[in-house]
């Protein structure tokens, strides 16, 4: 029987797999490599991790789902992508880990059908709708997967390393780790 508990476990399990992907693809890179922009847009790996922490985990779970204030966001344009020289790679990774821990507490303590505590008026202009935690989880799974893929491409440009994701599909159509 498929239950709400099982649904939450599946969604959170897949989100966790993508979060691990982010950490895994960056493992072994030097501080210089983590800060080196390789694409024309100018972002770098540490900036992506900070973006995942602030614009994704913090914003979607702490602000949207739990209703916390949005005044945490850096005031400068694209501030969530900026990593100062005084911020170490470990600081940025720890920030992301802390936001994941806080997000998980919100996810496990909130009903999947619960509406957002703090909807964002910008969603309409984005053509998006997030009526409940379930839709936010699906959005975050997509966002984190996309950004993990961006990091894959940059890592391959840095040193040729690739992150190969292999999943098998069970007879019920649910992905299972191999």
Residue ranges and their predicted role:
Residues 1-7:
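Short, contiguous pre-domain boundary segments
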Residues 8-27, 31-79, 120-178:
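Short, contiguous alpha-helical
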Residues 80-120, 132-145:
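Acidic/histidine-rich alpha-helical segments that form the ligand environment
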């Amino acid at each position: 029987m498929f239950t709400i508990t099982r649904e939450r476990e599946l969604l959170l399990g897949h989100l966790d797999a993508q979060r691990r992907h982010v950490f895994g693809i960056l493992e072994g890179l030097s501080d210089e490599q983590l800060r080196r922009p390789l694409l024309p847009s100018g972002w770098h790996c540490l900036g992506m991790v900070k973006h995942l922490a602030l614009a994704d985990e913090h914003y979607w779970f702490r602000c949207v789902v739990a209703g916390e204030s949005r005044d945490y966001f850096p005031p400068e344009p694209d501030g969530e992508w900026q990593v100062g020289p005084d911020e170490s790679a470990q600081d940025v990774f720890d920030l992301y880990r802390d936001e994941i821990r806080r997000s998980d507490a919100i996810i496990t303590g909130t009903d999947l059908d619960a509406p957002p505590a703090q909807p964002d008026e910008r969603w309409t202009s984005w053509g998006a709708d997030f009526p409940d935690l379930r839709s936010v989880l699906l959005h975050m799974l997509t966002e984190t997967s996309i950004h993990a893929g961006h990091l894959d491409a940059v890592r391959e440009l840095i040193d040729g390393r690739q992150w190969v994701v292999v999943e098998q599909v069970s007879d019920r159509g649910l992905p299972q780790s191999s």
